Amino acid sequence: MRFSSSFLSVLALASQALAFPLNDLPTTDSGLEVKLTSVGNTRMKAVLTNTADHDLSFLKFNTFFDDAPTQKVRIAKDGSLVPFNGIHRYYNIDDLPQEAFIPLAPGESVEAEFDIAETSDLSAGGSYKIFASGVIPIVAGPGIKVTSAVSFSTDEMTVDVDGAEAAQVQSALPEATLDKRTRIDRNTCTGNYYNALARALQTAAGYASRAAQAAQAGNRFQEFFKTTSPQVRQNVAARFSAIAQECRSPSGGRTTYHCQDVYRACQQGIIAYTIPARSAVVNCPPYWRLPAVVNQGFAPDMGYVVVHEFAHAPSIFRPGTVDHAYGYAQCVRLNSQQALSNADNYALFAAAASRR
């Protein structure tokens, strides 16, 4: 892979603190530096350096340092995005294990390698545009309570890929043995699993239906999507209506819902994940410990997670969403374009439309 330009992005800590009111955020002049380089045809190495004058930890989920086949970069060819064939994982930012964070002392660096051909088909070869953007939750000092976040956007780079070599890279996701597509996979969803998921789908259907109505005329649309455009309202309402319809199709929907980790992508702290390219949603063990219904606030319940995961699925509504941010405090800081493509903004709006 040849780089046409250097790829060095300095990331400043955004004044986004998840544990504080939005109008009373702690300020900081510290930051992070990320460098991405080629180490093979489609392999890349990311190096992140703590440029602050104090210790910090960053959440590795959905970053370059996530071991799972999550979306680490965006790839485009001939002006169109290359489809992403990996997973989108959902976690509760207020309930994460210590091992989900990577600590860095001042001046310390950490690096990770990954192969972009594991989650995208690059067998056509030729010239590709690579770029990345997102939000990295940060813990300042000891502990695991997220206190701020890094918002970053990299420069676009051009790379030349050997298509034949890229075609030899094995997909990061194992094949799962599945029956013909059904809404609920009865091989993994049995007994209490099936009953709990059926109730969650009913809850999610209610969330999505009320959100569709609120999207058309509600007064909190600007809060979550940073626009009041009638056309955007209509589009968001259409996504919610499609989600509600999917929730009401337990035996003939557009996705397959699994109650056990058939793709082996669960780990501690992960609640559920979606594989858009396979129209599959999978619940991880922590999902089954969530409350069935939450009546106020924005804490996740089983139905909330269903809305989040279904927002990812392009088989339900195109285009599917991604994960720029999680939780109310992060999500309401996104700009309109980011918010409209972020799964948790839809789940949060649905909660706001249904709860006290």
Curated annotation (Swiss-Prot):
Cofactor binding description: Binds 1 zinc ion per subunit.
Chain's role: Secreted metalloproteinase that allows assimilation of proteinaceous substrates. Shows high activities on basic nuclear substrates such as histone and protamine.
Gene3D superfamilies (UniProt xref): 2.60.40.2970, Collagenase (Catalytic Domain) (3.40.390.10)
Segment forming the signal sequence: 1-19
UniProt organism field: Uncinocarpus reesii (strain UAMH 1704)
Enzyme class at the top of the EC tree: hydrolase
Active-site residues from the entry: 309
Protein name as it appears in the record: Neutral protease 2 homolog UREG_03761
CDD domains referenced in this protein's UniProt entry, alphabetically: M35_deuterolysin_like (cd11008)
rRNA-binding is among the record's keywords: no
Pfam families: Peptidase_M35
Transmembrane segments: none
Sequence similarity: Belongs to the peptidase M35 family.
